[in-house]
C-alpha cells in the first residue's frame, strides 16, 4: 500500500489542533507546499518555515492561535482518496458552509481553492474540505 500524503497532512493538523499544540511538522513535497501555501493564504495557519533534519526537508507550520479554549477549531475532511477519486467540474464544486469554508482542488493549473477554480472556470479532483 502506498502513502497518502494529503491524509497525513490533514491528520497532523487536526491532531495538533485538538491537542492545542502550536506547531505541526510536515514532510516537504510539492503537494504539501502548495496545500500549506493555501492554508496560510486563507488564514488557517499563521506561519510556515522550512526545516532540514538528517537530509529530509520539513515544513513547520504554526497554527492560528485561539483566544478561548473552545473556539475556532479547524475542521478538515479528506474527500478524494487513492481508492476512490472524486472529480467535479467548476459548476458542481460544493460550497462549504455557504462559502465560509474552502475546497482544495487539484487541477491542470495546480492545486487551487474552489473560488479560484470558479473564477478560472476549471474543474478537477476534490482533495479536501476545510472549514
UniProtKB/Swiss-Prot annotation:
UniProt cross-references to Pfam families, sorted A to Z: Ribosomal_S8
Q: Extract one GO BP annotation from the record.
A: translation
Task: State where the protein is found.
Answer: Plastid, Chloroplast
GO cellular component term, pick one: ribosome
Q: What is its main location?
A: plastid
Asked whether the keyword Ribonucleoprotein is assigned, the reply is yes
InterPro entries for this protein: Ribosomal_uS8 (IPR000630), Ribosomal_uS8_CS (IPR047863), Ribosomal_uS8_sf (IPR035987)
Keyword terms, alphabetized: Chloroplast, Plastid, Ribonucleoprotein, Ribosomal protein, RNA-binding, rRNA-binding
- Tell me, how does this one assemble? Part of the 30S ribosomal subunit.
Family assignment from sequence similarity: Belongs to the universal ribosomal protein uS8 family.
What is this protein's function? One of the primary rRNA binding proteins, it binds directly to 16S rRNA central domain where it helps coordinate assembly of the platform of the 30S subunit.
NCBIfam families xref list: PRK00136.1 (NF001109)
Know the name of this protein? Small ribosomal subunit protein uS8c
Which organism is the protein's source?
Phalaenopsis aphrodite subsp. formosana
Gene name, per UniProt, is rps8
Amino acid at each position: 500500500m502506498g502513502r497518502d500524503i494529503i491524509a497525513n497532512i490533514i491528520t497532523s493538523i487536526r491532531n495538533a489542533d485538538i491537542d492545542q499544540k502550536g506547531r505541526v511538522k510536515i514532510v516537504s513535497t510539492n503537494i504539501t507546499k502548495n496545500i500549506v501555501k493555501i492554508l496560510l493564504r486563507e488564514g488557517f495557519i499563521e506561519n510556515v518555515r522550512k526545516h532540514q533534519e538528517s537530509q529530509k526537508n520539513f515544513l513547520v507550520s504554526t497554527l492560528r492561535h485561539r483566544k478561548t479554549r473552545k473556539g475556532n477549531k479547524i475542521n478538515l475532511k479528506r474527500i478524494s482518496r487513492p481508492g476512490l477519486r472524486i472529480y467535479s467540474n467548476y459548476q458542481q464544486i460544493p460550497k462549504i458552509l455557504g462559502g465560509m469554508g474552502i475546497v482544495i482542488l487539484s487541477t491542470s493549473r495546480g492545486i487551487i481553492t474552489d473560488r479560484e477554480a470558479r473564477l478560472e472556470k476549471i474543474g478537477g479532483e476534490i482533495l479536501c474540505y476545510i472549514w
